[in-house]
Amino acid sequence: MALKKDVYQAFEDVVGPENVTDDPAILDSYAWRSGLVAKLDKFVPRFEAVTLPKDTAEVQAIVRLCNQHGLQFKASSTGWGPYCDPAGPGVIKLDLRRMNRIIEINEKNMYAVVEPYVIYAQLQAELMKRGLNTNITGAGSNCSALPLAAHSNLGHLSVSGSYGERNQ
């Protein structure tokens, strides 16, 4: 299912023409199967288009457009996981790589507010400048810090689910 020109134009109006594409070569790069699954296919279904929003306002506008036009959407940051793949046709990809800012580091209460594409290495470097540390999961320092924190409480050394002495 190819996007209608007016729908594609609406996505361009939100993120700019340089931050949306339906080029088959680029869509195929997003369709490489990223996880271990029982199927032998090397590719998942293609997204209808890929968008690269820069902030929450653009994310909200993309979601509104998807809802208006009966499209599904799938957002991902660094993309390490099969949950980033489309389940079928009619899906718009929100690649959040432009959302890579550390908004706040609260040293007193030991938390950070980050955008989705902030990777552990970036966060750790800023924390170390302040004498702080974070738990970098087994996924590695090139993975986004946000999804794992939201999904699994940031690992075994997190403040709220700790087995470690550092939180006393």
Regions found by a protein language model. Name each.
Residues V114, L127-Q168:
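A gly/ser-rich beta-alpha-beta helix-loop segment of oxidoreductase catalytic cores
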Residues A75:
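Short, basic/aromatic recognition patches that contact phosphate-bearing ligands
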Residues M1-R64, W80-M110, A125, A139-N153:
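N-terminal flexible segment immediately upstream of the FAD-binding catalytic core
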Residues Y117:
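Extended, alpha-helix-rich binding/interface surfaces that flank or overlap catalytic cores
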